């Protein structure tokens, strides 16, 4: 096999016949090969499934989540997993209005573009919102607001990486994996406690 190796944002990309081997399918194939610890918890917005890899929190899934939204490997119950226990503690404090910023190890699995969007979500302050266009400009792709919306919709770590804080250009609430009523509830909770 012949190919050209190039530096690619700190990683090696192997190009063979024009194919980028860091394509989404290859990224997700790697994540499907791993087993993930999980724990279900009750919350004010319904049951949440917390999922951790061996390096950090990998997902927070909604009770009625679309199974194809977040691609993960096999899950096994581990209610004593340290990352999951700490995530539950911080989520409880968040819902009680006692926590405005999470401090957890995160393990985002996605494309480089998706990870740049998800990293931008982490910069949105508690109680504030940003538009898809603002996020697109922040990550250096000012015309990619639709792609930002798609990446936002695939955010695997809801609430902690606050995709609920992203709204339409007019300020209207737009799609959310947990449902628009949940998005409105999370934003309302944050507005009520934004002076913390």
Regions found by a protein language model. Name each.
Residues 1-33, 174:
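N-terminal amphipathic/basic-hydrophobic helices that include classical n-h-c signal peptides
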Residues 156, 160:
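Major-groove DNA-recognition helix of helix-turn-helix-type DNA-binding domains
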Residues 21-142, 189-196:
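Basic nucleic-acid-binding alpha-helical/helix-turn surface characteristic of O6-alkylguanine DNA
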Residues 169-196:
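…primarily DNA-binding HTH/wHTH and HhH modules…
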């Amino acid at each position: 096999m012949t190919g050209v190796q190039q530096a690619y944002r700190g990683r090696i990309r192997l190009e063979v016949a024009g194919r980028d081997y860091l394509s989404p399918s290859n990224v997700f194939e790697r994540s499907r090969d791993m087993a993930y610890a999980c724990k279900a918890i009750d919350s004010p917005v319904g049951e949440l499934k917390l999922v951790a890899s061996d390096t950090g929190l990998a997902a927070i899934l909604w009770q009625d989540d679309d199974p194809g939204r977040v691609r993960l490997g096999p899950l096994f119950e581990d209610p004593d997993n340290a990352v999951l226990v700490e995530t539950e503690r911080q989520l409880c404090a968040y819902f009680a209005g006692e926590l405005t910023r999470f401090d957890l190890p995160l393990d985002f699995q996605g494309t480089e573009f998706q990870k740049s969007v998800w990293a931008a979500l982490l910069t949105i302050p508690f109680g504030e919102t940003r538009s898809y266009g603002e996020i697109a400009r922040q990550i250096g792709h000012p015309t990619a607001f639709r792609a930002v919306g798609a990446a936002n919709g695939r955010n695997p770590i809801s609430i902690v990486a606050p995709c609920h804080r992203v709204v339409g250009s007019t300020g209207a609430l737009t799609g959310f994996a947990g449902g628009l009523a949940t998005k409105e509830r999370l934003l309302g909770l944050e507005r009520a406690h934004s002076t913390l």
